[in-house]
């Protein structure tokens, strides 16, 4: 019988091959895991690392998580759409779209219900035109399905080319002005005035004071390029609201009721479509506007971010662009079913790409973060309009960037672009801004004999829009 020393010698003698087998299996597991990640997400170890991709995904989420509070806040203006359900729908649409982008397109772009598009849904289609939110959801669904068809055909290019470049630039700027105006109004910084239409509110007290302080602080974070500045600014403003009361109600601006809870059901808004007016001209105009904004928003974001990050080929083309656009369209269809406005690719994806994200793994991590956020709805839903207002205003500033590309020395381009921009906030309607812009562009250049500048399809659009104003 061997003694203790003998057993010890046998253990260590046999332990070496055991350890070697363990290390070999461990290395094989890592190898197969990396191979799986490469295949599933298009990950290339030559251009990035797994750690970098994970950090990039977290960064992207932090920069766009504000939508989880802002979107339910915007939809709160509508009856019949519970804030908790809209929050869940927002998160689910973001998860679905971002996962499709990660696993199918294999790109580091994240998706969520789009700013501007949610404002158009609520304030133009429902409150402005007087249609139900079910009508608007139906328009979003149709837009998503059409977007899929257009992406699979050459029609998308025809539509894109039919709109003058100056009008394309002006639309983004106009939407920026529109959502900034909504933010200022929600905050009480800009209020109704029977004599002058609008005037400044009392910014020395209540929600206007909280929003103004939040705006300055958030702007400071943006200037300093602090990662997640919009989310940090929004949460900080909400915390400030816990210590300041609203004179109108006597309650604190912010009142938290919890931290963690199960996600609220989307049943009240799930697949609530209205088919009775799908052939009306208003439906056509609403669908066109949704699709137009979604298409150019997505293309502009993807092209701009990809070019800046060097994610293009030697000819300047973006590999897999059609898959990116299809992922966007599929997300819109899914979002409409869940009960929220058009889901689109977020320009905030640039923050994660700037951190080194280059594959679908970045988007996958962002989707996981949205999944976790589902269980923190009490925090996001407690954030008041005074805290989301600074985000709306600053996002409006971001959307004004294309204005520098409009040639204001050429009045045949500048005047229609200007009309497009100012009509959106002043008419409180994104679609009216687009229609007036295209009509004015065609008529001004037609009278100026600039026939070659006008795309044939633009004549058709202008005629349809004029008919809409005359007969409806």
Language-model-detected regions and their locations in the chain:
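Juxtamembrane transmembrane-helix boundary signature
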Residues: 93-115
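Aromatic (phenylalanine/tyrosine) cluster motif
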Residues: 11-12, 22, 31-32
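Helix-loop-helix junctions within the multi-pass membrane cores of secondary transporters/permeases
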Residues: 34-71, 93, 114-123, 127-175, ...
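Membrane-embedded alpha-helical modules
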Residues: 129-243, 364-472
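Intrinsic-disorder-associated, low-complexity terminal segments enriched in Asp/Asn/His/Tyr and depleted
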Residues: 7-9, 26-27
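N-terminal, intrinsically disordered charge-dense segments
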Residues: 3, 15, 20-21
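Loop-to-helix transition at the N-terminal end of transmembrane alpha-helices
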Residues: 80-99
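Helix-loop-helix hairpins and the membrane-proximal interhelical loops
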Residues: 33-85, 199-200, 234-322, 465-467
